[in-house]
Structure formats: structure tokens, C-alpha cells
């Protein structure tokens, strides 16, 4: 029986592609850097932020430039929504630390206040390096309150506001219109999922707010006559709006609305896949055991993978170690393919 670790090149390549994707998105949103692509989808700012704060722990420059962007554009971010999408305690602490730093250096007036830090006996190093622990002479006083040790940081002042006409920044146009609120997210979901006739559960999941917040936003929009509700069952309703009228209001010609991607689900699955890969990289196991771990990962995340439209390997057709190859192609490669450019002129519609 062959005993080996997961090929380090596979994990490193996967991590590199996630970091590159994050750089590409933020560069289009105003972070200092070269925007080498022009995506035709609408990004979810808080989902991308929760994702980036984790993957950028291995890319300090990206982490710091995103903080600078947050400082400049703090009034465009929903702290509550960010915490809602931070599904793990460590992610929530990272988000709280980032919000606290941005609030300290921002000139924007918002009603949002980051939660106070927690008592930590042994703070952990924020940045992770394969070459060993980073020496920190002067820890940042804000981050250490949230349990993270990193070098003291001042704003780079290189960031810019998002260009509202870019498809990727569509969410910010709606926030300009409705404020940073559940209403802005509800309208975004209804506009971009217009043909799908989303149910309340779909809207709640994509909006990133509580069910109560989404209900209140929908009721207000229905009362205002800009959203239409149809009773489809005793306890089931569908919602829609006049896409042409909204496109005209927003100055979007020929109904060329951005593509919808279910970013919270997709980015969370990608993050969990990276964590899983890194854990396998540290231990030796047979090809059979690695394939067994892959089978377990698919089973643990089957609901999310199927919701994203990922075609899962047939466990009956691929037995034992034979499961690994189709897993790599059908799951890993497919998820990465969804991060490839979707241009304003046309492209793959991910996760519709």
C-alpha cells in the first residue's frame, strides 16, 4: 500500500488561485493594484470580505490593502451582514478586528460600531508563513485586542471608491439608493434572479440578513408598489419586480444586468476545501485513505455543492482510490472554474 501526503503542489496551486481571485476582485473594487480583468458579475462585498480576511493571512499585502479600502469605504459595508456571513468564531473575530481598525482610521460617519475585543491569554499570529513564525516587534494595538498579533499598521491611502458603473460594483449602486440595508440586498437578489422567481428562503440566503429583516424589507417594497408578491401555496410566496423599469432607473441599457453568483455559498465551500487540503497535506496516508477523505468531504458538503450545481462523482462507479481522480476534476476544478472571468460582454453564469 502506497503511503504519501497530498501533493503540496496541488494545495499550493489551489491557494494561489484563491488569492489571485481575491486580488482581481478587489482591484476592480478600488483596492490599489492592477485590475487585469473586467468581470460581468455582481460581487457580494461582505462575502468577499469574509473570504479574503481568511485567505489573505498568507498574503499580508492583500490583507493590508483591503483594510485600507475598508477605511475609505466604511460607509458602504454592513458590519451586521459581515458578521452574519462569518460562520466561524475565528472569522467573526477577524472581521471584528478589521472593522475596528477601519473605524479607527476612517473619516466616514456611520452608525455601525464593531464589537469590543475579547480577553485572550495567548494571542495568535495573524499572518501564516510556510518558512516559520513571523517576528513582531511592535504589535498593532487594535488587532491584539481581538486576539491577533501583527505588525503595527498605518493606512496606505492608496485605495479608491468603487466605480459604480462597473458590473462588479452593482451592489454599491443599490446601497447608494437604499442605504446599507436589507432592502438593497433584497432588490439585488430579485433583479439578478429575475427569471428564477426566488422563494423567500432563497432571498434570505442570498441577502445575508435575518429572515425577519428580509420579511420587513419585502413587505415595505411590496407596500411601495415596486415589488410584487404572488401566493404560490398556503405558506409559500414568490416575489418579483419589473426588471425593465429598474434597468431604466439605474441607467442600464438593453437589460444588461450583471450575472448572479451565490457568493456566500461558493466562497465558503472554497475556503473549507482549502482548509481540508491543508489538513491532508500535514499527514501521511495511503491513496485509498486520501480518496476516502475526499468522499467524506463531498458527503459533508453535499447540500452546498449540489446547490451550486457541482456534478458529484458517483461513489458507486469509483471505488476505493479510484474516487480521487474524478473528485479532483468534477469538484476541485469545477469550483475553480467558477472563479474564471465572466466579462461584461458575456460569460459563464455561475450558480444561477
Predicted regions and their residues:
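Long, low-complexity, charge-rich intrinsically disordered regions
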Residues: 1-165, 252-352
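Short alpha-helical segments that sit at the start of domains
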Residues: 157-188
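Short, cationic-aromatic polyanion-contact patches
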Residues: 174-183, 231-255
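Helix-turn-helix/winged-helix DNA-binding modules
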Residues: 178, 194-195
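Short, locally clustered residues in the helix-turn-helix/winged-helix DNA-binding domain
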Residues: 188-194
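Short acidic, hydrophobic short linear motifs in intrinsically disordered regions
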Residues: 195-206
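Short amphipathic alpha-helical interaction segments
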Residues: 208-224
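A short, conserved structural fragment
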Residues: 222-233
Amino acid at each position: 500500500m502506497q503511503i504519501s501526503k497530498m501533493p503540496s503542489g496541488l494545495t499550493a496551486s489551489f491557494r494561489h488561485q484563491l488569492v489571485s481571485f481575491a486580488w482581481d476582485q478587489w482591484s476592480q473594487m478600488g483596492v490599489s493594484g492592477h485590475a487585469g480583468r473586467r468581470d460581468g458579475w455582481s460581487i457580494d462585498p461582505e462575502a468577499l470580505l469574509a473570504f479574503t480576511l481568511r485567505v489573505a493571512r498568507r498574503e499580508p499585502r492583500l490583507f493590508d490593502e483591503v483594510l485600507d479600502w475598508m477605511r475609505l469605504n466604511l460607509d458602504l459595508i454592513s458590519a451586521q451582514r459581515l458578521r452574519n456571513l462569518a460562520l466561524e468564531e475565528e472569522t467573526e473575530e477577524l472581521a471584528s478586528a478589521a472593522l475596528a481598525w477601519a473605524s479607527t482610521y476612517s473619516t466616514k460617519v456611520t452608525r455601525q460600531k464593531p464589537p469590543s475585543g475579547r480577553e485572550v491569554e495567548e494571542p495568535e499570529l495573524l499572518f501564516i508563513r510556510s518558512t516559520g513564525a513571523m517576528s513582531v516587534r511592535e504589535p498593532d494595538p487594535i488587532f491584539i485586542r481581538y486576539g491577533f498579533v501583527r505588525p503595527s499598521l498605518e493606512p496606505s491611502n492608496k485605495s479608491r471608491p468603487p466605480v459604480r458603473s462597473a458590473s462588479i460594483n452593482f451592489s454599491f449602486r443599490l446601497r447608494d439608493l437604499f442605504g446599507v440595508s436589507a432592502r438593497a440586498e433584497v432588490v439585488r437578489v430579485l433583479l439578478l434572479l429575475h427569471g428564477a422567481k426566488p422563494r423567500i428562503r432563497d432571498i434570505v440566503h442570498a441577502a445575508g440578513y435575518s429572515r425577519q429583516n428580509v420579511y420587513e424589507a419585502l413587505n415595505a417594497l411590496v407596500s411601495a408598489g415596486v415589488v410584487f408578491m404572488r401566493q404560490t401555496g398556503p405558506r409559500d410566496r414568490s416575489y418579483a419586480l419589473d426588471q425593465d423599469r429598474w434597468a431604466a432607473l439605474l441607467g442600464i441599457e438593453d437589460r444588461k444586468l450583471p450575472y448572479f453568483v451565490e457568493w456566500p455559498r461558493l466562497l465558503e465551500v472554497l475556503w473549507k476545501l482549502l482548509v481540508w487540503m491543508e489538513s491532508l497535506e500535514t499527514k501521511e496516508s495511503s491513496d485509498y485513505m486520501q480518496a476516502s477523505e475526499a468522499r467524506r468531504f463531498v458527503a459533508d458538503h453535499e447540500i452546498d455543492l449540489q446547490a451550486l450545481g457541482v456534478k458529484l462523482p458517483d461513489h458507486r462507479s469509483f471505488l476505493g482510490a479510484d474516487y480521487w481522480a474524478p473528485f479532483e476534476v468534477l469538484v476541485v476544478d469545477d469550483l475553480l472554474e467558477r472563479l474564471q472571468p465572466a466579462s461584461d460582454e458575456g460569460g459563464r453564469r455561475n450558480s444561477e
